[in-house]
């Protein structure tokens, strides 16, 4: 089997570019071969050299070389701040290149809808959205159990994502990750909501298969911060069930504490990212644990350089992200006409991306009106 060739836009010097690179390389079926890794040409060349790939000063030059037959690419991964996603993804899709894009999908809902229209026109260029947690086998199992009716009719969904890294005005110190995430010109209309609230939303809706009708929200921020760092939403789901979503970046002591509890008429399913290899299924008075792992404590400083993932995640975080790349890879191989390709799982794509943007618009609008109900 020939390896798929992957290009990357952004990600140079950033922690998540490295995570994508490792996830792509985890299987022997894909490899990163080129990238426009940074807006600074000198740094772009530096990071490309570190990875041993062809470096480009900008993504347009990389696409042009692919179109001219000077570069072999099968898809592109976009790992840039939110405000750049639409322009870059549109350029790739317009050229016929499949895309794996970081979330949230875009800077504005208008951009998201334009991107969806383009994705529909380019049926031979699949589009994937990297909601990494949906790649965890236990979350995929939860989705299958719900589809099989194991918990009955869904009555209530609690979904959350707790972090503590923005409990102070870290962006004022020049910390790069904090600076762009709290800047409306780069992140969009919501900070915490766009960064991790969309994870909590898609984790819940993708797993249950439900939509969302309307929301009542309260968003707050530390004095001196331009965007929300605490994001709380009450929602009505498409079947009439209640969703309670909380996302915060000011919960001191939390790294990446995300998960959900889904209550049905016949049972309950619960999953926590910090115990990602464990899925709790409650059926009446019995509890089934599908897989149990031993939580890993914080590593001492001498061992931290051996970690390959963001703090607060388990090592299987790489495998979860790799699973999303595998789903996209399989779609591409089928479109190429390859035989005996295993079926691709239905991981998030353009529709979930648009839903996430509609959700943010409704939540921000509701919060501005003191929690008034807003349609999604």
Predicted regions span which residues?
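Short, Asp-centered acidic motifs that coordinate Mg2+ and/or phosphate
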Residues: 34, 75, 156
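Hydrophobic residues in well-ordered beta-strands that form the structural core
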Residues: 57, 101, 107, 127-129, ...
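C-terminal glycine/acidic-rich active-site capping loop/insertion
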Residues: 237, 266-347
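Glycine-rich, aromatic-lined ligand/substrate-binding cores of catalytic
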Residues: 194-278
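Beta-loop-alpha module in the N-terminal Rossmann-like domain of NAD(P)-dependent dehydrogenases
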Residues: 53-118
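Predominantly a Rossmann-like dinucleotide-binding segment in NAD(P)-dependent oxidoreductases
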Residues: 13, 125-128, 133-225, 279, ...
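N-terminal Rossmann-like dinucleotide-binding module
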Residues: 1-51
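C-terminal helix-rich "cap/oligomerization" subdomain common to oxidoreductases
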Residues: 1, 77, 120, 323-376
């Amino acid at each position: 089997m020939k390896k798929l060739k992957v290009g990357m836009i952004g990600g140079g010097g950033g922690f998540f570019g490295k995570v994508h690179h490792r996830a792509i390389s985890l299987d022997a079926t894909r490899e990163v071969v080129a990238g426009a890794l940074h807006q600074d040409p000198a740094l772009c060349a530096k990071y490309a050299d570190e990875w041993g790939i062809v470096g480009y000063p900008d993504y347009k030059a990389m696409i042009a070389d692919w179109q001219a037959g000077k570069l072999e690419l099968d898809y592109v991964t976009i790992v840039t701040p939110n405000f750049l996603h639409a322009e870059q993804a549109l350029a790739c899709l317009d050229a016929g290149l499949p895309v794996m894009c970081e979330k949230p999908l875009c800077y504005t809902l208008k951009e998201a809808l334009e991107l969806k229209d383009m994705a529909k026109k380019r049926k031979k260029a699949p589009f994937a959205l990297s909601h990494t947690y949906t790649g965890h086998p236990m979350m995929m199992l939860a989705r299958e159990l719900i589809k099989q009716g194991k918990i009955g009719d869904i009555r209530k969904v609690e979904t959350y994502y707790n972090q503590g890294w923005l409990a102070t005005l870290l962006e004022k110190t020049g910390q790069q990750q904090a600076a762009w995430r709290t800047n409306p010109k780069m992140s969009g209309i919501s900070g915490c909501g766009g960064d991790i609230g969309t994870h909590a939303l898609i984790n819940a809706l993708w797993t249950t298969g439900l939509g969302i009708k309307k929301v009542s929200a309260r968003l707050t921020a530390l004095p001196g911060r331009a965007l929300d760092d605490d994001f709380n939403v009450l929602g009505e789901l498409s079947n009439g069930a209640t969703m309670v979503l909380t996302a915060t970046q000011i919960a001191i002591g939390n790294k990446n504490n995300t998960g959900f509890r889904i209550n049905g008429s016949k049972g309950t399913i619960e999953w926590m990212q910090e115990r990602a290899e464990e899925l709790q299924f409650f059926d009446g008075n019995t509890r089934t644990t599908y897989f149990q792992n031993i939580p890993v404590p914080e590593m001492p400083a001498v061992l931290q350089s051996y970690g390959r993932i963001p703090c607060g995640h388990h090592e299987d975080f790489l495998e979860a992200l790799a699973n999303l790349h595998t789903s996209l890879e399989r779609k591409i191989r089928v479109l190429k006409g390859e035989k005996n390709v295993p079926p691709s799982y239905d991981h998030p794509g353009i529709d979930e991306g648009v839903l996430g943007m509609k959700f943010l618009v409704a939540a921000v609008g509701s919060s501005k009106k003191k929690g008034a109900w807003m349609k999604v």
